[in-house]
Design a protein with these regions (language model features):
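Histidine/cysteine-enriched polar flanking segments
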Residues: 1-131
Length: 131
């Protein structure tokens, strides 16, 4: 996450420093700078919107967008970063009001980490269990 598009933002200095530190310590890696959206709720409270809250799913990148001018920039950046993936923009402007976004609502469970007994219960449709 970068904030190049919002130099007056309170997060600008910290994100700029992070980008510079990454360039210094990881020069062999390409950085892709996503813009910083600015979204507030009905009371004017800033919401934690970020284009970096994306999710990779097989050959697709599910990219949160927020009905902001920066959406198009974020899509272009992600197409550059993932040229062999389909970029699927997902409107998260309502979801971010719950203080999370696309990646936040997903649950990644690594293969072979759940107990067989738990999986058996889930296959039967049981979603609440105690063990």
């Amino acid at each position: 996450q970068a904030a190049f598009n919002r130099p007056q933002d309170s997060h600008y200095a910290g994100l700029k420093a992070l980008c510079e530190e990454c360039e210094q310590y990881l020069p062999q890696h390409t950085q892709y700078h996503l813009p910083l959206p600015y979204i507030v709720d009905e009371d004017g409270v800033r919401l934690p919107a970020s284009y970096a809250n994306f999710l990779i799913c097989n050959d697709a990148v599910l990219l949160p967008i927020y009905k902001q001018d920066e959406d198009a920039i974020a899509i272009d950046v992600m197409q550059s970063a993932y040229p062999n993936h389909v970029i699927e923009p997902i409107d998260c402007s309502v979801l971010v009001k719950q203080y999370g976004s696309l990646h936040c609502i997903s649950m990644q469970v690594p293969t072979n980490t759940l107990q067989a007994s738990v999986l058996a219960l889930l296959e039967k449709g049981v979603s609440i269990y105690a063990q």
